[in-house]
Amino acid sequence: MGKRIIVAGGGHGGIAAAALLAEQSFDVTVYERNRREDMGYDWTDIFDKNGLFACGMEMPPKEKYRLKNDMTFIAPSRTAKIKQHVPEEQLEIQMERKDIYDHIIEFAEHCGVKFRFETEVKAPVMLGGRVAGIRTKDETVYADLVIDAAGINSPVRKNLPDCLGIQKETDKYDTFHVYRAFYNKTATVEGDKYRVYLLFDGKQQICWVADDEEYTDVLIGRFTPLTDEEVEETLTKLRELNDDLGTERLRGGQYVTIPVRQPLGVLVADGYAAIGDSAFMTVPMIGSGIANSFKAARMLANAIFADDKELYSAETLWSYQREFYKKLGNGLAPLAVIKLMIASFSPNDLDYCFEKNILNSDDMTIGADTNSINCFIKKMMNFDSLRTKTVGVMSEPEMSKKIFAMVTRISAVMAVTRAMPVRYDRRAVNLWVKQYNKCFKVD
C-alpha cells in the first residue's frame, strides 16, 4: 500500500473516498480551491443518512440535524396542490452545508487524509492516455490515481482527451440554475410549511418558500441563468402569496448551478475516476446527490482495494463503474428521461396532470430511497391509481404523445444500461457510451 492518490476538488464523495483509502494506508491528498472556512454554501441540504453509514461515518450530533418537512406541490394555476406524506423511516435529514463538511472533513482527517485548501486544480496531467496527476496554478503534482471530485464544471474532466469517451460538457436541460436565500420571517405558518411552486408565474421555473424556526427559506430555479432583476421580480410575486416571506435577507443569496441529469456515461480511465457532481450523481428530479456520492465512495474504494497489482487502470476500475450502475445508475438514468418530459410541459399540461390525478401524493412522496425508476414503478402498481392515470392520459391526445415518447425512451435507456460491457475495452465502451448519451439528446 502507500500508493499516492490525489482527490481533485473537495466534493462530498471525493472526501469520503479519501477517508476510506487513507484508513487503509494510502497516501491521499485533497486539493480544494476554497478556504477551509468557506467549504459549503450558506444554506441547508437534505440527504439520506444511510449514505454516511455506507462509508463508515457515524451520525452527526443530534443538535446538528433534523428531519425534513413534507413538501406541498402547487400547480401552475394555484388551483390545486399535492402534499407528500413521507413515512418517518424514509425521512431524510436536513443539515447546514457547512456542518456536513465539518463532519466529513473531521472524519477524513482522523483517517489520515491531507488537505490543501486554497489550491485550485487547473487541469489533469496526461502521460499518453493515462491521467498521471494534476496541474495547479503553482505546481504539477503526480499521482498513481486522480479521483475527480471537482464538481459539475470539473477542469479535470473537461480537459481529458476525447479518445477516453468521457463526456466533457453538459447539454440542454442538464443543469439547473438556482438562487437561494433566507429572509426574515414575517408571519407564523400553520399549514403547509414547505411550499413548492411548479412552473411558477407561467415560466419554466420551480420556486419554494419554506418555513423555518428563524427565517423563511426561498429557492428560485430555472434551466437558464437568472439575473438579479428576474430574482427580485419573482420574490415580489412570491411575497404576494406568502405572508411569512420578508424583505430582509439574512443569509445566502448565492447563485449556483447544479446537475439534474443522468449519471456520466463513463466514470473511469487509466489513472482516473469521477465521483459526485463531477460524475453527475444527483437524482435528476431533485438535484440532490450527497447520499449517492457517499455510497459511490464505498464502491470506488472497494474497486481500488481489489486491484492487488495496484494498476488503477480503466480495466481494474471498471468494477466501480459496474457496481455504481447496478446499484444506482441504472435507476437514476431513466429518471432523467422523466425530467426531460416534465421540462417540455406547459403550465396547462401540468395543471391537467393535477386536475385529472395523473399526479398524486404517492408520486410526489420522495423519500430517502427514491433514487430509482423502480421506486416510481412500484407506486404505479396500485390498480386504482394506474387506472386513473391511464384514463387521464388517454383523454388528452397531446399528453398521450408525450407520455408514450417518454415510456419509449425509458425503455431504450434501460436496455442500453443493461448492455454495458462487462469488462473494459475502450472501443466497446466508446461504442456503448455513444448509445447511452444518444438516449438523452433533445432538439
Residue ranges and their predicted role:
Residues 1-11:
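Beta1/beta-strand and adjacent pyrophosphate-binding region of the FAD-binding site
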Residues 8, 22-41:
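Glycine-rich FAD pyrophosphate-binding loop
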Residues 14-15:
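N-terminal Rossmann-fold NAD(P) dinucleotide-binding loop
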Residues 35-75:
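N-terminal FAD cofactor-binding segment of flavoenzymes
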Residues 78-97, 133, 212-224:
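Helix-loop-beta segment of a Rossmann-like dinucleotide-binding subdomain
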Residues 107-243, 280:
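Predominantly flavin-linked oxidoreductase catalytic cores and closely associated redox partners
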Residues 121, 226-304, 308-322, 326-330, ...:
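FAD/FMN-dependent oxidoreductases across multiple families
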Residues 305-443:
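C-terminal helical "tail/cap" subdomain of flavin- and related membrane-associated enzymes
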